[in-house]
Amino acid sequence: EALLSHLETVDIKEDTEKGFYMPVQRVCRPNHEFRGFQGQIENGAIRAGDLVTTLPSKEEAHVKSILVGDKEVQEAVQGQPVTIQLDREVDVSRGCVLTIDSGAVLTDSVEADILWMDDNALTDGKNFFVKIGTKMIPGLVTKINYSVDVNTGEKKSAYTLKKNEIASCTLEFSEKIVVDEFDRHRTLGELILIDRVTNM
């Protein structure tokens, strides 16, 4: 079967991401009267007046204004970079998440599927910087649960992980952070392990 004709028959998977969420990339405070949270909307839409929840602080505030560039708008949607001003002070910094009904969770440990790309093997007990969304924190690989045969999908017992191998690993973080399953929220469901010495 030709590739083009096959692609024409493929059933496109429905987008399963829920609610609104925006990882905060930067806090903008040009003067004492304005404090805006900048980032890209990863899912959903936000409108002036909406009630948002801040994570991990779990505070609630209403949207006072939304800026796209230097233009104030009443609504912004997925994919747009925005500055959001809230109607009261909240405990938010880079790496925090603004959300409405997203169902994202706070946790200090996850089980993640890892594709290992380093020449040196991965072993239990290795420390990393872990980047999820706009947040980067210290983390630890506490256990390699099993590796996955890329040809058969078979799960195999594993104690180390070599370059280009895939495994399920348990990770612990230095603090509770906002995460979710990749199928539910892509940005909050993917992570990068960064070597604390080489930054690679």
Predicted regions span which residues?
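Canonical P-loop GTPase G-domain recognition
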Residues: 1-19, 23-28
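C-terminal effector/interaction modules appended to NTPase cores
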Residues: 32-200
